[in-house]
From Swiss-Prot:
Family matches, as Gene3D superfamilies: Leucine-rich Repeat Variant
Keywords annotated in UniProt: Protein transport, Transport
Stored Pfam families: AP5B1_barrel, AP5B1_C, AP5B1_middle, AP5B1_N
Record GO biological process: endosomal transport; protein transport
GO cellular component: AP-type membrane coat adaptor complex
Function as written in the Swiss-Prot or TrEMBL entry: As part of AP-5, a probable fifth adaptor protein complex, it may be involved in endosomal transport.
Keyword DNA-binding: no
Assembly description: Probably part of the adaptor protein complex 5 (AP-5).
Keyword Transport: yes
Name of the featured protein: AP-5 complex subunit beta-1
Length: 883
């Protein structure tokens, strides 16, 4: 196959990244991977394009390397490419990506072990690359490759802890000798190796007995077996691994750590954070080393403006607490956090991070051991006086500040706290004013979240809660479309305040406002929102539903609601009725509810609403209230196949409308498979349930074919042979195409699902059919027809006819096999190594081929009445000749 150019590979990579599985359905994994590896060695492909091609190995190694044999072959090919590349600055980026690709393939596909020759060669290659300290051998141009090799080794050490623990002396010497910009990578590599080595020794518990010294001075082969039984050290874990080195070992280790800390200022802030965290874990395990070793660094870190460095302080404090930080240090850090949360030069996400640090501050002596939000004991009301939220803050800052201040005022008493609570209530009211004046969606959501926070912390303040309830009622009456927000507020506060009456008080107040509304146009316009509120209120057994039943009766009797027959409104009415039917005090409203249901079942102009009203009426008049509540709240037993009883249909989460709802299937249970030439079938996954009323739907992705009608299959059972379905294709143009396929089906529990199937690919070869000739035509007549068509298809400027020649090196026997396998049905004559092939492509086009072999070269002479077919034919001939 001819090599693809760079533009073609760019399109190929984009197509693969968008849908890897779909892409590989059209071409074999081995073929595509082989083509990719081959073109990586081609000089015709640009370097940037090769990097894009290797991105496929970095992002999708599990797709391209499904087995160990493929992994080894891929890694070996990439290694050979790397070794053949010149050590030039121009090829440096590509060489770095080759290292990353090899490592990714080996690690991701679980092939990096001592049984893999490529793994051993790759690890040795990385060590060889980083041994060129200070660019003495390869020069400055090779420095990016050394840096990448260091990062690769660090990744290997992170994935396989202890892998480099027997090379520590060499790594330490290289780290000390390196004085170029690559020093940072060498330092991080050595620090990770040191931490893992000490953690490995600490697992044995007790004194090290010289093992630590031996590890620090080791310079042997890779430690392949060190990847087992390793645990992660948490910042505040009470089950840390401990190592007790001897005095001489402690001195050596302390000297190494001190040198690493002295070099920390040479690193970038992010790398400093990584370095500090590794050393923190080392000191936490080696108990003979005091955390005071970090004191000299704290002086510099306390004044930092960098987020990563400040995070290092918090990590140290979480691990070492008062063994490193005094009370004054803790007070200073809290003041610093408060100041940083409002620093004008910091971005909003950074300030929110500092606010979150306040809520999870690692105290020296915390009052509680839980990991939830808790304020530091040293954080006072006066310290947070500048954190009051205002409407000019962004919404996240506004809510976070309100949360912090609410906790401060809740834990403190006195006049400051009372004033603070009043200020917070004023802030909530300022948000209310913005929402009341038609605030946008974001302001509305912020207001309700602010209300939730205020109720969470200050529900005991009766005066503020009464004022809040009044404002909420006023807001709802002015904007009833906020009903979902009110329902969510009631639900969440009821969960939060299980035994508090405020959610019920708000519900009762909303009910009172709604039922007193007149049945005018404004009320009818917002009736849907009112019914949602009443449906939620009806779920409270402590609230009488007499006024609700009378309001519904008045709305139905005094309006044209029934004559309009709106299905959605009717079901909203019946949803309220369903919850009223479950109310404990049903006898008080029996007559009103019965009149309402009877009126709906006779007058409402929608058959579904009538049937549902009739069901409720029958239940109301024939079943006791105790049984009625159980029936309407009944759910099917777990594992029960037939779950669609009338009672389950009418529950809140499985109401009548869900029977008409088509759900998206969580996983695909069906797939199309070709079972015979020209025929497609679909099969069922072995552990799938029985499916019924299956409808296959096909959607054109272009205009090349007529639409395919839906195909209906009555049922599909796991233990039976899958049915065969025939798909009738009517092409408008004889070009390859793709049909999007979906299936709608029902399961045994009565639920209807829709799922997308793999696309149906129609290839160019599948459109070939023999010339539509009578079956009894003699061969001579067919031969004469071919000759006349060949002459008729001679191209000129007046038609779309075209001729072309395709040549490929092959023997006579190979050519005969290709014709026999691919064109036997279309052959007009086969005489003396010459073949004449005639192909008809619906709706009205033809391809004629005169094939012969000369000097071990097959020559395909082609004529067609549609020149647009030639590129597709050329690709097809390339495919069959390569096979």
């Amino acid at each position: 196959m001819a090599e693809r150019n760079s533009a073609s590979w760019n399109r190929k990579v984009a197509s693969f990244c968008s849908e890897p599985k779909t892409f590989l359905c059209d071409s074999s994994v081995d073929g595509f991977l082989g083509e990719l590896l081959k073109d990586l060695q081609s000089e015709a492909i640009h370097g940037q394009t090769k990097i894009l091609m290797m991105d496929l190995l970095l992002e999708f190694p599990e797709f391209l390397c499904p087995d160990q044999k493929t992994v080894e072959m891929t890694a070996e090919t990439l290694m050979n490419i790397l070794k053949k590349m010149p050590s030039s600055e121009r090829s440096m980026t590509l060489r770095c990506h080759l290292l990353l690709a090899i490592e990714t393939v080996l690690i991701t596909c679980e092939s990096f072990n001592q049984n893999s020759k490529m793994a051993q060669d790759f690890a040795s290659l990385l060590m060889h690359i980083i041994s060129d300290v200070n660019d003495k051998k390869q020069g400055v141009a090779n420095r990016p490759l050394r840096t990448t090799a260091c990062e690769c080794l660090r990744e290997l050490e992170s994935c396989y802890p202890g892998f480099l623990s027997q090379r520590m002396e060499k790594l330490y010497l290289m780290q000390q000798q390196e004085v170029t910009a690559a020093h940072q990578s060498y330092t991080l590599l050595y620090t990770v190796v040191l931490k893992n080595a000490i953690r490995f020794l600490a697992q044995k518990e007790g004194p090290s007995n010289g093992a630590l010294k031996n590890a620090l001075l080791s310079n042997e082969d890779f430690f392949w077996s060190a990847t087992e039984n390793m645990v992660e050290l948490q910042p505040s874990s009470n089950e840390q691994l401990l190592l007790l080195p001897s005095n001489s070992e402690t001195k050596d280790l302390k000297s190494i750590l001190a040198l690493l800390l002295e070099d920390s200022y040479l690193l970038t802030p992010v790398c400093q954070n990584t370095l500090f965290w590794q050393i923190v874990q080392v000191v936490a395990m080696a108990r003979t080393i005091s955390p005071v070793i970090f004191k000299s660094q704290l002086v510099r870190l306390f004044s930092t403006m960098d987020l990563s460095c400040f995070h290092s302080i918090l990590q140290m404090k979480a691990v070492f607490t008062d063994s490193l930080f005094t009370g004054e240090d803790e007070h200073f850090l809290i003041q610093r956090l408060v100041g940083m949360t409002q620093h004008p030069l910091l971005s909003t996400p950074v300030k929110l991070f500092y606010l979150d640090c306040l809520l999870h501050f690692p105290e020296n002596r915390p009052l509680t051991s839980n990991s939830e939000e808790n304020l530091p004991v040293l954080l006072t009301v006066q310290m947070t006086s500048s954190l009051f939220p205002n409407v000019f803050n962004d919404h996240s800052t506004m809510l976070c500040r309100q949360n912090v201040l609410s906790m401060v005022y809740l834990e403190n008493e006195g006049s400051y706290s009372e004033k603070g609570i009043a200020f917070l209530f004023e802030h909530v009211m300022s948000l209310y004013s913005m929402v009341h004046k038609n605030g946008n969606r974001e302001i509305t959501a912020t207001f309700f979240r602010a209300v939730h926070l205020f109720v969470q912390y200050f529900n005991f303040c009766e005066k503020h809660m009464e004022n809040l309830t009044e404002k909420l009622l006023k807001l709802y009456m002015s904007n009833s479309s906020l009903a979902p927000n009110f329902i969510n507020l009631i639900n969440q506060t009821q969960i939060l305040l299980e035994f508090h009456v405020w959610p019920v008080t708000l519900s009762k107040a909303l009910q009172k406002e709604i039922v007193n509304l007149p049945t005018d146009k404004w009320t009818m316009k917002n009736l849907g929102w009112h019914l949602k509120i009443l449906s939620r209120v009806a779920q409270e057994n402590s609230i009488s539903q007499s006024s609700t039943a009378l309001f519904l009766r008045r709305v139905v009797f005094c309006s044209d609601l029934c004559s309009k027959g709106d299905w959605r409104t009717g079901n909203a009415l019946l949803s309220v009725c369903k919850h009223v039917l479950q109310h404990q005090k049903l006898s008080a409203i029996f007559v009103h509810l019965a009149d309402l249901l009877q009126y709906l079942m006779h007058r409402f102009e929608d058959i579904d609403v009538q049937d549902r009203a009739r069901l409720y009426y029958v239940l109301l008049t024939n079943v006791s209230s105790d049984k009625l509540g159980k029936i309407l709240t009944m759910s099917p037993a777990r594992g029960q196949t037939k779950s669609r009883s009338l009672s389950s249909i009418m529950t809140e989460n499985e109401n009548f409308s869900t029977m008409l709802t088509i759900r998206n299937a969580e996983k695909t249970l069906l797939c199309l498979q070709p079972v015979l030439e020209g025929i497609k079938a679909f099969t069922c996954i072995s552990d799938s349930p029985s499916l019924y009323c299956i409808v296959l739907q096909f959607e054109n992705t272009d205009c090349r074919f007529e639409s395919i009608s839906d195909i209906n299959v009555p049922c599909l059972f796991v233990d039976r042979k899958p049915p065969v379905v025939t798909i009738n294709l009517v092409p408008k143009e004889p070009y390859p195409t793709i049909f999007s396929v979906s299936a709608t089906y029902s399961t045994q529990d009565g639920i209807t699902y829709q799922t997308k199937l793999d696309p149906l690919y129609i290839t160019f070869r599948e459109m070939f059919i023999p010339l539509p000739l009578p079956a009894l035509w003699p061969l001579e007549s067919r031969f004469d027809l071919f000759g006349k068509l060949w002459s008729a298809f001679k191209p000129d400027e007046q038609n779309q006819f075209e001729e072309s020649i395709f040549c490929y090196e092959m023997s006579n026997n190979s050519l005969h096999d290709i014709v026999l396998d691919n064109f036997s049905k279309f052959a007009v004559s086969c005489n003396g190594g010459e073949y004449k092939i005639a192909v008809f492509l619906p709706p009205q086009f033809h391809i004629l081929m005169h094939i012969k072999s000369q000097d071990d070269t097959a020559c395909f002479s082609v004529r067609t009445d549609n020149w647009n077919l030639l590129p597709y034919l050329n690709s097809h001939l390339l495919d069959i000749t390569l096979q």
